């Protein structure tokens, strides 16, 4: 039993890393008042772009950078439609998800079944990697796993302990008041949404370059939707996002580990989404949203009064 739990934990961390990247970015985007339902499209485009660039150049780090950039570019498109044009944020995000899924399928046809030109391998940390049990459990992962973990305290500190973090939160709570104090609401929202897209792209890149080093059409398998629920589960807090991402990562791992026990694979495939629906149901309603700390101006377009 102990071995089973340890084996699940060992895989849950890399499995949850794409979710962690996406959630950290979405926390910042929503803290600015912008909901991004295009995360799924940005992640899948990050996955195909990262794999394609790595395949073309043989340099996996160029693939990582390309994955992040394509996520950021798609996010800028979302920012333009939802912040500048003030289009409904749900419609804009859903459109980007459909665009990403369709475009990635078209671009990825040539890479189906192709072996990766390079991949992000595990990095061992001196002394720490040799620790009994803990060494293999926490200190033998690819570089993006460590980057995601390092970003958690950094982003928490920026959000709660810096002037820019206060500015970001004020824009998400009361953009009119922030504007009256001289804050450029549009610029802050653009930056937050762009950052969210970069993180989503990194999450997709991790999928195709490290966790499952290959291109598989639709390989995000709904990860972007889980990110939306995780953002609520984390109560828009980077530290809680770490716990939630690895929890959902463990649930996804259980899909495969429990199949030998005779449990229906269809039921197991539903597990992450059952949890997602439960989180969304628990957060439904204006009273509950306020209680769990949802940004007051989330999904509210802002037009400066002349």
Question: Across the structure, where does each feature detected by a protein language model lie?
Answer:
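Single transmembrane alpha-helix segments in multi-pass membrane proteins
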Residues: 7-56, 64, 69, 73-90, ...
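Helix-loop-helix "hairpin" substructures at the membrane interface of multi-pass membrane proteins
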Residues: 137-215, 238-243
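Transmembrane helix-bundle core of multi-pass membrane transporters
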Residues: 100-161, 263-268, 295-306
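Short loop segments and helix-boundary regions at transmembrane helix junctions
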Residues: 29-35, 74-128, 161-163, 219-222, ...
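Loop-to-transmembrane alpha-helix initiation sites
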Residues: 89-91, 117-121, 140-147, 189, ...
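Hydrophobic core segments of alpha-helical transmembrane domains in multi-pass membrane transport
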Residues: 22, 47-51, 101-105, 147-156, ...
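Transmembrane alpha-helical segments in multi-pass inner-membrane proteins
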Residues: 210-273
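Cytosolic-side transmembrane-helix boundaries in multi-pass membrane proteins
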Residues: 155, 173-187, 255-306
